[in-house]
Amino acid sequence: MAPKSKKQAATQSKSKKSKDLVDERFQAIVLTDSFETRFMPLTAVHPRCLLPLANVPLIEYTLEFLANAGVNEVYLMCSAHADQIQEYIENSKWMGDNSPFSVTTIMSIESRSVGDTMRDLDNRGLIAGDFLLVSGDVVTNMDFSKALQFHKQKKAQDKDHIATMVLNQASPLHRTRSQIDPAAFVLDKETNRCIFYQSIPPVSGKKTCISIDPELLEDFQGELQVRNDLIDCHVDICSPHVPQIFQENFDYQYLRSDFLKGVLTSDLLKKTIYAYISKDSSEYAARVESWSTYDAISQDILARWCYPLVPDSNLVEGNSYSYELNNIYKEDKIILAQSCKIGTSTSIGRNSSVGEGTQIKNSVIGRNCTIGKNVVIENSYIWDNAVIKDNSVLNRSIVAADAQIGNNVTLSPGSVIGFNVIIGDDKVIPHNVKIVETPIVTENEFGDFDDESNSEDENEYEDGNAVPVLAVKDVELVGETGKGFAYESEIESGDEDDEEFVGNGTYSGIIYQMKSLNVSDDSIASVSNKKVKKHSHRRRLSMNSMISDNGGAFESDEGEEEEDFGVEGLATVTRAIENNHDIDTALLELNTLRMSMNVTYHDVRSVTTQALVNKIVDFITTGTLTPQEAATKIFTKWGIMFKRQVFSPEEEVDLLNIVEEKSSVLDKAYNQIVLFLGVKSFYDMEVVEEENILKWWNDGENDEVRTLAAKFITWLQEADEEDSDEDDEDSE
């Protein structure tokens, strides 16, 4: 073979270098939105990733981690408050010449879940190779190079490997471990390949178990380990296949309960996911996903458990914190009265002043704050420009920027005082009360109607999927000179996390509680003024304000273990749901079973309904979804099966009777929700016609389980009357 010319060699060398540069490019995708409402009402005004944590915007900790991880390109996927995030980044050090990576903000305004964001990411074609997927609320000092090396090793060994989860070992009851969404990982003990994932109920003294489909273990040879001692910060190293899988499965909304579980149980994808577990006790990793973890991580930062992520590292340009004994941090230009006492684990920002006789410990004070005389502040977080007047007591509370607390005010544990709120003198704010400057009116997740409110202003929820909020200024709460409205979200009313933050406090002081069903006439908005011909356009009704997310236990009577259609059919549909089979495959298997066992379509409808209800209850009792979210998710995805199981008006009525029967034996905390959303979903999907719904209703008994559905029936009847009136007018 003739020797290569110098020109050919130079060209090939240049090509190789160019390829190496491409291969070395390491991208990071940051999900700036959590798509949750746990930090409402504050996140109605500012994005969670810009809320201050130890006087540093939360996203700075994530970007610092990415800088140490060797990332070259960072894409910030922004939805809620995207303009604020973009403005902050443009004025930050990360846009300077010395930034270790390039930063691009992607306006993913329409995204309403992690799944939507991943599908948007796939559509944009930004991913060049393996990338790091991380939430914008992560605080960690881990050595990422070890995790990346583990990922590359597994990728070389396993051609089906598509992702590596980066997990941190800790006690199951560790305070930074999620108590909202805890989970167990079933791993191959030798390789750390994830075999199964299951959400588990929050620690409550109840026993729980992990149910694994034996089919998942058919090809497995080795030893399994069940890990309930891992902190999952949602830090993942992903291949380009991950966004593509979200694209192919449009119903995937969540990273773990949908994507991870779906991949592991799919008999079509045949992809593998591994877990890198950091066992180094010096490595810290946590997510600020709730008020309790906000408190815990703040205290860990002050106590220097997150070193070098500590206040005196001055992560943000312009910060000037210095460290003193007992974990006290001070910026310059602060004024401390001679008789004030600054206790352990306290940080005070620039230009803040503290009056005579005031005591502060285990707290963070922002910049330009004014703290009066004889004030007591413990385990609380005061943000920039806040004013706390004389003789006030704050315990485990949040006071947002520009808020004012009057003289002789007591903030009980769990209090959240929103931006610009004013609390008058001599007031006591009860446990867990949240106060906002103005009422919040938002579009609910069904997207159709809003409840009436005294304000015309609208603010977006943290995740864009909000629930209407009752808000009325209460002089008893904020005082004559005060400014603010009690805030209580229907979603949050069932959230136990606030109680965690305050030490099992209660909601006794809330002005408006929404823990029980709210079935007021005002809950239903009027139908559009446009003429609607009967059956030509299906009406849409939002009933979100009528539903709370109280849950309860479900006990099922399994009956005899016989090989009959009841058992086989139920197992078939359940397996289809768990493994996320396509609808046609599930129906084919079920129909084959029906013919082989010579049963009626009534039996088919019965086992299908039972399987759907069982999955809804599973979501609820494991704390994975609220009753409303669970019923909506299952009926919307799998209710379409009934279109090929009902063929006459009588069978439509029979289906509704079955759903009512299955719902009636559920826990009373959510059985009405399951029945109502089942009926409404079947109507929306045109599985059952309006007249057959009314026939079912009129023929049945007025049981308690029908209470919530009654409003839907009333709406149907009134809308039908309007149609009749319009038809009469047209005929005239």
From Swiss-Prot:
Its biological purpose is as follows:
Acts as a component of the translation initiation factor 2B (eIF2B) complex, which catalyzes the exchange of GDP for GTP on the eukaryotic initiation factor 2 (eIF2) complex gamma subunit. Its guanine nucleotide exchange factor activity is repressed when bound to eIF2 complex phosphorylated on the alpha subunit, thereby limiting the amount of methionyl-initiator methionine tRNA available to the ribosome and consequently global translation is repressed.
The record's subcellular locations are:
Cytoplasm, Cytosol
W2 domain location is 559-726
InterPro entries given for it?
ARM-type_fold (IPR016024), eIF-2B_epsilon_N (IPR035543), eIF2B_epsilon (IPR051956), NTP_transferase_dom (IPR005835), Nucleotide-diphossugar_trans (IPR029044), Trimer_LpxA-like_sf (IPR011004), W2_domain (IPR003307), W2_eIF2B_epsilon (IPR044123)
State the disulfide connectivity. Answer: none
Domain of life, per lineage: Eukaryota
**By which gene is this protein encoded?**
GCD6
Specify the protein name.
Answer: Translation initiation factor eIF2B subunit epsilon
Per its UniProt record, what Gene3D superfamilies does this chain match?
Answer: 1.25.40.180, Hexapeptide repeat proteins (2.160.10.10), Spore Coat Polysaccharide Biosynthesis Protein SpsA, Chain A (3.90.550.10)
Q: What is the lineage of its organism?
A: Eukaryota, Fungi, Dikarya, Ascomycota, Saccharomycotina
Q: What GO terms are given for molecular function?
A: guanyl-nucleotide exchange factor activity; translation initiation factor activity; translation initiation factor binding
Q: Which family does it belong to?
A: Belongs to the eIF-2B gamma/epsilon subunits family.
* Alphabetically ordered keywords of this record: Cytoplasm, Initiation factor, Protein biosynthesis
| Principal location listed in the UniProt entry | cytoplasm
What GO CC terms are in its UniProt record? cytosol; eukaryotic translation initiation factor 2B complex
Self-association and partners: Component of the translation initiation factor 2B (eIF2B) complex which is a heterodecamer of two sets of five different subunits: alpha, beta, gamma, delta and epsilon. Subunits alpha, beta and delta comprise a regulatory subcomplex and subunits epsilon and gamma comprise a catalytic subcomplex. Within the complex, the hexameric regulatory complex resides at the center, with the two heterodimeric catalytic subcomplexes bound on opposite sides.
What does the record list as GO biological process? cytoplasmic translational initiation; translational initiation
